[in-house]
Amino acid sequence: MVSLICTLQSHRDDVNCVAFSGDLLATCSADKSICVYSSRDFSELPFSPLSGHGYGVHCCCFSACGQYLASCSTDATTMVWSMDTGEIEAVLEHPGRSPVRVCAFSPDSSHLVSGGSDGSIALWDFTSRTLRRTGVVNDTSIVACSFTPCGQMFITGSTYGDLRLWDLNMNHLHAEKNAHDLGVSCAQFAPKMMKGTDGCVQFRLASCGQDSLLKIWIVSLLPSAGIKMQLAHTLTGQSAPVLSCAYSPDGQMLVSGSVDKTVTVYQADEGVLLYTLHQHDRYVTACAFSPTAPLIATGSMDKSVNIWRMEEGSSAQGKSLPDEKAAFSNTEGRKACGHSRLMVSEWSEEEVLAWLREEGLEAVTDAFKSNNIDGEELLSLSKETLSSDLHIESLGLRSKVMKKIEELKMVPVYNGTPDEFLCPITREIMKDPVIAADGYSYEREAIEAWISTKNRTSPMTNLPLQTTLLTPNRTLKMAIFRWSTSQ
């Protein structure tokens, strides 16, 4: 059977990607951050969240050894982070400054590939952190990429609907046009090579798309040095666009997440549906298997990440699991699993104390407890009140507390905020919404900064803006004002 063991709720916006290493889990979000957890107890690491991207983070992936994490963003960069310190090791600027939608390491981590919204592909030499080759698929966005197990080729998937196979010299080896009607959303090779009946090397590839289908392909390297790609299975276990898919470490199982809010688990060889998991409240955008434990992580637009455990001998074909919340017991002295930082003003005194312990501020918990500090009082504190009323004598300690409080105040998005009130670039509530030439509304300051640095292309469509004229959206501004005053 499959059981839900933990729900992580650290992000303030849509979760876009989840990735496991041997002992870590990374999640990234439209809130511009990356969270990193221990995969043993799912406590958040001391240096998490990672903040460095200027816009939403679309994808993240670990190097083979787990020492590095790569993340890519609308800000046109792929960042490399040290998992020892949480520090930025390198910032790789995508050719043409296009938003970067996807990134992937080769199995030996010698190469890193990234795909852009303008159809550009960058192949990086990871050892030297230098650009090795570039390629392009015209009139589309690259939203999926994955290396073959041998590391000598990689696949890309686009919003146009095609799958394309490339070698490390960016030679185009094969194109499977119209692989998914309306566009590909994800593609991943199984981790192991196979041999065909004629002795040729074969790879299994899973892909999913806006056509609500999950497909399994056999990619064969023919003796004549040609490439043959055959459709082996078409899986129809979900009723809406399938946004993500991932193989288990042994290649025996396949998981997928969908707009219909479900997670499906298949036996990969025959495409047999094993489980349908119901838990998320919105689209399931990301999924991944742990390489070292029978665990699945799923991420969603409901801002949460669910951790599922696969029990040995799971074979209940087609079983649909009920929508039940599972408890998770936290151990003392670490960050509480799934502790929400939204609506701080509504925190109870106990939640404030839990937050202090999470932030390593145990030294002031007695003072806060004796003064009955709840969320509303927490936000009103100053250095002066910490000294005069709470009698915290250490200047350094007062400064640390105020720094953490200021970080809480910077959280811009609250539960229940209508999505149309959020700027597509910053994902923050708009104060001065304007309509750009692409028809979308943005925060004025954000779109002006975008236009000045992004060669006048639309943040939403990546097509050229016919004019830089911005029209105030007074109707939206009034709607935001009415909503905010009612909260």
From Swiss-Prot:
Residues 347-411 form the SAM domain. WD repeats lie at residues 10-47, 52-93, 95-134, 137-176, 179-227, 237-276, 279-318. Residues 416-487 form the U-box domain. The keyword Iron does not apply. Keywords: Repeat, WD repeat. SMART domains: SAM, Ubox, WD40. It comes from the Eukaryota. This is WD repeat, SAM and U-box domain-containing protein 1.
